[in-house]
Structure formats: C-alpha cells, structure tokens
Amino acid sequence: MKIIAFDVMGSDKGVGPAVLASINFVKKNLDYKIILVGDKTLITKYVSENERIEIYDEPLEVKKGENLKAVLSKTTSMSVAIDLVKDNKAEVVLSAGDSASYLALCVIKLKRLEGITRPAFMPIFPTILDDKKFVLLDVGANIEVDTEYLVQWAKLGSVFAKIMWNIDKPNVGILNIGTEDFKGFKYHQEANQILKEANLSEMNYKGFVEPRDILKGNFDVIVADGYGGNLVLKSLEGTVIDFSSLIKRKITSTFFRKIGALILKKSFKEIKEHLDYRNVGGAWVIGVNSIAVKAHGSSDEKAFKGAFNQIKIAVENNVIENFKEIL
C-alpha cells in the first residue's frame, strides 16, 4: 500500500475540495491510502475514516506570510504531514499551504538530496505541442541564486524528465532576456559556460532561452532564478485565464460570431483544457529526499486530482530512488 500524507488545511477553498479529490483518488487507485491531516470536525463532514482514508486531527494551520521562526516552533497540520514522511509512515507529502513555510519544513525535516545546495519549486507546464511538457525550476523558492544552484537544477530537472517522461537526453535551457552568451547576470553567464563545457551525458544543454519561446516545445527543462521563474509562472497562469475570457467575449459579440463559435466550440474547449494548469495540479519541492508536492492555494477538486495523478506517476517510477542513483 502506497501512502500519501495530505495537509488539507492550507487551501483557500477550505477542506472540501481536498477531501473530495482524496476520496475519488483512492476509489480509482486501490493500492493507495491517504492520511488527511487537519481539523477532524471539518474533514468528517465529507468522509469518515476507512481502510484507505485515515484522519490525523491537527486543526492548527500555517497562516500565509507567517513568521518562519514561529512556524518552525509549533505543531501544525503541515508539520504533522511532513513528519509522517520523515518517520516513514507515508511516502509522499502534499499541501496547498504557505509556500515559504512548506519549503522550509520540507528542507529541515526531509533533508536535501546529496549534492543539492538549495531545493527548488518546480511545476510542469504544457506546450503548444500535444503531449509535450516541460519543467521550470525555480519558480520562487530562491529569489537570490548562485551559479551552482542553476547548474544543480539543470541536473535535477534533466533527471526528472528522463525518469518521468522516458527522455534519454532532455533538452535543457536557462531562462534569460536573450540567447547571446553575454546576456543576463553573472550567474546566468557562468552557469551557461559551465553547462556548455561540461557536455553532460544526462542532458542536451542548448543554452539560453527567452520567455517567448518556452511554450514551443523545444525544451524539456528550463532553469531560472526564483524571481524570474515566478514572474513567468504567474504570467502564464494569468494569460491563459484572461485569454479565455477575451476569446469568449469576442466570439459572442455578434450573432454571426456566435454561429461560428458553435462550429468551433469543441476546438476551443480542447485548447482550454490543454492549457489548464489544474491538470498538473502542483509544483514539486525538488531536491529533498522524498516526494513533496505543493498545490496552488486556490486549488479546486480538479487541481488536487491533477496533483494526485502527478504523484502517482512519480511513485510508480521510483523517482527519489532514481534521483539518488543517478545524481
């Protein structure tokens, strides 16, 4: 039985979507068990304990923006969920709680993979090509970075793509404001030079990539400092939502456009579904000794479903064991 520890207290939408997604996941995956960590009085409004849903009663949640020193000094639903993995009572931890607190607790309790200085947040993105995705790391865990972080993340991302997507030599690039070697900050330039000269067997390093090119499907792994990566993440999320609204407004503005929209309705629906970030559901805390996934604070049931599906693929591909072996 594979066990997931799920901190259900951090979601903006309450515990409901998290619990309902958990129920549906274990119904469809009979070899999985989920430990729901949170306020039992809230959780039991949706589900009672059974052989594959267990409840740990810990109502105290980490508040967004809470002082890290205070977070680390007390017991919360987030810390309990991570402790379950640390104590080998679960294999995976999932939370939609405060990002900074989650990262800090994961690093302190689960420890870093050997050779990794700073873990990163790593979401998976769709591209304009069917069945083609890429990972972007970091997207906010490390605002200030050193050259070695970018080099390490390139290796982490390439190993992830190799394991999860069965790509022999993933295409890797560093996010920058231009593709020329002299562009960017010193750490961009140095990491670019190191990766070019290293000619590593686990990746096909292609140099710098500009933000406008990341959705074309030419890269499997894109490395960024946390500040730039977070801007890209939020820009992409916002663009998809706003573009969908724009299309809907334009195609329903006249009678004839509405007729055309009916013909194209299926295509529009497929595009929207293809670009819906909820299908992925979360970002990895990549670089720690266990599978740790951070769901978006605004996650609904569909987003949690996406996170569970991502976790299932990772567990069944023995991602952490492969990381340790390859790195």
Swiss-Prot record:
Origin species, per record, is Mycoplasma mobile (strain ATCC 43663 / 163K / NCTC 11711)
Its gene is: plsX
Name of the protein: Phosphate acyltransferase
The record's function comment reads: Catalyzes the reversible formation of acyl-phosphate (acyl-PO(4)) from acyl-[acyl-carrier-protein] (acyl-ACP). This enzyme utilizes acyl-ACP as fatty acyl donor, but not acyl-CoA.
| Keywords assigned by UniProt, alphabetized | Cytoplasm, Lipid biosynthesis, Lipid metabolism, Phospholipid biosynthesis, Phospholipid metabolism, Transferase
Q: Note whether Lipid biosynthesis occurs among the keywords.
A: yes
- Family that this chain belongs to: Belongs to the PlsX family.
GO molecular function terms listed in the Swiss-Prot or TrEMBL record: phosphate:acyl-[acyl carrier protein] acyltransferase activity
- Kindly give the Gene3D superfamilies that the UniProt entry links to this protein: Isopropylmalate Dehydrogenase
Q: How does it assemble?
A: Homodimer. Probably interacts with PlsY.
